[in-house]
UniProtKB/Swiss-Prot annotation:
Record-given protein name: Holo-[acyl-carrier-protein] synthase
Main location: cytoplasm
Gene Ontology terms describing biological process: fatty acid biosynthetic process
Binding site for Mg(2+): 9, 58
Source lineage: Bacteria, Pseudomonadati, Pseudomonadota, Gammaproteobacteria, Vibrionales
Localization (cell): Cytoplasm
Pfam families to which the protein is assigned, alphabetical: ACPS
Main EC class the enzyme belongs to: transferase
Gene Ontology CC: one annotated term: cytoplasm
Protein family according to the UniProt entry: Belongs to the P-Pant transferase superfamily. AcpS family.
EC numbers on record: 2.7.8.7
Assigned keywords, A-Z: Cytoplasm, Fatty acid biosynthesis, Fatty acid metabolism, Lipid biosynthesis, Lipid metabolism, Magnesium, Metal-binding, Transferase
Superkingdom as given in the UniProt entry: Bacteria
GN (gene name): acpS
Amino acid sequence: MAIVGLGTDIAEIERVEKALSRSGDAFAERILSQSEFERYQGLKQKGRFLAKRFAAKEAASKALGTGISHGVTFHDFTISNDDNGKPILTLSGKALVLSQQSSVSHIHLTISDERHYAVATVIFES
């Protein structure tokens, strides 16, 4: 296995919370996939959840080498959790096509947050 992509991102939770207060769920709908949005709707700490998802998707787009551009959107990345809480990143759309072109066979994702920030790192391996 070889690393074919590495990305990291940090998001300020308060900034995400302000965006939510300005635009409401429209901001969340722009960032989250349908399954993520359904989970988000039942949460108390929506800003924290969204900041972690935002950081993870930005990190994934950087690992892909495109950022959120060139046809890659936030909806191309879905984050779920396994039974132990480990985050799982699933690709779709243009992100999936580009990852297949780079022979990505394994994705590593870690997400962490503390009082003011959420951070994520993504590694793509072939």
